[in-house]
Amino acid sequence: MGIAGSHLVAMGLLALTSQLHAQTTESKGTLTLEGAKAAAAAAAAEARKGNEGASIAIVDDGGNLMYLERMQPTFPMGAHISTEKARTAALFQRPSKLLEDAILGGRTSLLAVVPGPLQGGEPITVNGQIVGAIGVSGASSAARDAVIALAGAAALAGKPSAAR
């Protein structure tokens, strides 16, 4: 095989490799610290509407803590619980309430793998992609935890600047 033939083979392999690479990876947004703070601020504003405190945790899509705010008054354990609710919503890519319902419905084995199976964790979606999650604990009820979390998640919906 001559030099021209070798070049053709190399170019073909390069094209095939590029094509395979394009098929096995995709771009996705990443929640920014500014986005995490904006979600927490919206959640805190919702909590203040009800004159209540809450712990608000924001995690990235891998469940890693990005931002935590413990409003007053709320109990100290709320910081841990809110983080676990957020991790559950991020890692399972669904509201933590759905996992709580599954456990209450008899799927008790989920307790071994779900970090925070309580209402109040919501995925954060930007441009149709889950980029993180918010967890809230310590409001006046589990239902209020969820409402506050939804307010935080909704603050970033449709805001591509929250993810890079």
List the predicted regions and their residue ranges.
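Bacterial N-terminal signal peptides that target proteins for export
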Residues: 1-9
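Flexible, solvent-exposed loop/hinge segments and secondary-structure transition points
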Residues: 22-164
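N-terminal signal peptide c-region/cleavage motif recognized by signal peptidases
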Residues: 17-19
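Sec-dependent N-terminal signal peptides
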Residues: 10-15
